[in-house]
């Protein structure tokens, strides 16, 4: 029931990325009790506790692992569903468009099943993008005004099958 910080992520997708290895070294020395993701997504410089990939289409094959670093998907998913009256704008954006709750649930289950199949191959973690819809992105499990898109019980059953 308590939030916690388990990893530091100084850079995401090269946004403001500079002096990468110096920054990662500083963070690892400053807080040796937590993992350091360096960086999440695009421009990896070979430092940090994990090699973080972003995946939005398919999950058939795990990227080549690196010795001494965990392989994770720091972002995956991107399944979009517009729910009338629960978005900031009439149109939103996502990688995979669905037209109904049923389509969203099917796409979500297929993607998580594929991700789960990569665990025995060495996938150490994956973070669904994203928990909630935001202004222009409708990829969330919850709408912009924090209503469920999918019944929590159905999501739990999918997760239990994989884990």
Question: What is each stretch, according to the model?
Answer:
Residues 1-159:
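Substrate-binding/catalytic cleft of secreted carbohydrate-active enzymes
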């Amino acid at each position: 029931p308590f939030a916690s910080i388990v990893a530091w992520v100084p850079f995401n997708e090269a946004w403001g990325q500079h002096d990468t290895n110096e920054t990662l070294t500083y963070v690892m020395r400053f807080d040796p009790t937590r993992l350091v993701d360096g960086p999440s997504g695009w421009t990896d410089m070979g430092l940090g506790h994990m090699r973080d990939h972003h995946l939005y289409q398919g999950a058939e094959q795990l990227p080549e692992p690196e010795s001494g670093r965990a392989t994770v998907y720091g972002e995956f998913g991107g399944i979009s569903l517009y729910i009338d009256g629960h978005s900031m704008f009439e149109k939103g954006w996502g990688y995979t468009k669905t037209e109904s709750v049923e389509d969203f649930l099917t796409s979500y289950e297929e993607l998580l099943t594929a991700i789960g199949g990569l665990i025995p191959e060495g996938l150490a973690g994956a973070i669904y993008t994203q928990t909630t819809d935001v202004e222009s992105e409708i990829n969330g499990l919850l709408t912009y005004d924090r209503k469920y898109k999918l019944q929590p019980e159905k999501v739990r059953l999918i997760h239990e099958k994989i884990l």
